[in-house]
């Protein structure tokens, strides 16, 4: 119990939870805040080697600290806006997605060095027909399997995001210019975010805290991180938290990332499609 409370204390202090609380309380987030979050991990990690009580959080601190550091060094929302404003939607987004792949491969390499196993970081398709746990979810019929639930969650996520973007408004334009680019950007973005917030995080938390905590930690960090993302606000947090929960659960139960990636990919197609239409509408397609 004590180590679990410590884990969640670190999540609260170093994850986007702290950043969102600061933003709501003060109206802005200082530029140094990202480095303060990294500092929390930098202090907790060596402490985990000195004190037996802190040992279970070493994996989380190492992996999440690395994620925070590389994100702070190589990316950021303001830089994303700068790329899109300077180069237009397609070249700007392509540059961002390539940058995302560099980050994802670096994080996966770091996670692999810790586990020395591709399956240990879920970097494989997985057992696509694995049963959904717990068994009571199947009620009285045959076992509910991920080959059914995976596509259903993906399609439901796509419909939810479609409702969100249409409600919040989007420019109208010839969709043929952006459709294939939206698919490409969604495929890359889904892989990048799954690598960071599922493969790396889940594989770091799972050995010491079990499936439930691994799923919840991934869900909270991914979901709250969309407070300023797309979709954003409380609706964005709820939608992405639901996606994050099912994606992390699918990754653990199928022992792979294909279904998590697919569930993420489908709503991302909608996001990038309408984002691109907005760019076209403002004559910034590139």
What are the functions of these language-model segments?
Residues 104, 143-151, 182, 186-187:
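Residue-level signature of transmembrane alpha-helical cores of multipass secondary-active transporters
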Residues 171-183, 232-234, 238:
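Juxtamembrane helix-entry segments on the extracytoplasmic side of multipass membrane proteins
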Residues 32, 36, 87-98, 181, ...:
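Membrane-interface starts of transmembrane alpha-helices
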Residues 127-143, 191-217, 252-256:
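Membrane-interface helix/loop boundary segments of multi-pass membrane proteins
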């Amino acid at each position: 119990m004590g180590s679990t409370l410590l884990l969640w204390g670190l999540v609260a202090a170093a994850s986007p939870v702290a950043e969102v609380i600061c933003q709501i309380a003060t109206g802005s987030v200082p530029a140094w805040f990202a480095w303060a979050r990294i500092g929390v991990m930098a202090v907790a990690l060596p402490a985990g080697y000195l004190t037996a009580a802190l040992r279970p959080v070493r994996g989380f601190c190492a992996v999440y600290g690395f994620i925070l550091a590389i994100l702070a060094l190589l990316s950021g929302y303001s830089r994303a806006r700068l790329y899109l404003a300077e180069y237009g939607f397609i070249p700007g987004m392509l540059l961002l997605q390539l940058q995302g792949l560099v980050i994802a491969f670096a994080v996966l390499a770091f996670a692999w060095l810790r586990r020395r196993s591709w399956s240990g970081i879920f970097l494989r398709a997985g057992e696509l027909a694995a049963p959904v746990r717990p068994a009571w979810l199947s009620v009285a019929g045959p076992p509910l399997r991920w080959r059914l639930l995976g596509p259903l969650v993906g399609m439901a996520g796509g419909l939810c995001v479609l409702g969100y973007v249409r409600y919040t408004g989007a420019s109208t334009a010839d969709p043929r210019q952006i459709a294939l680019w939206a698919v490409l950007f969604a495929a890359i973005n889904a892989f990048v975010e799954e690598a960071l917030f599922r493969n790396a995080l889940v594989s770091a938390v799972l050995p010491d805290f079990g499936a439930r905590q691994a799923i919840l930690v991934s869900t909270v960090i991914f979901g709250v991180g969309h407070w300023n993302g797309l979709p954003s606000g409380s609706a964005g947090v709820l939608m992405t938290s639901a996606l994050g929960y099912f994606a992390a659960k699918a990754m653990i139960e199928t022992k792979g990332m294909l279904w998590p990636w697919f569930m993420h990919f489908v709503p991302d197609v909608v996001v990038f499609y309408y984002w691109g239409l907005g760019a076209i509408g403002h004559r910034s397609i590139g």
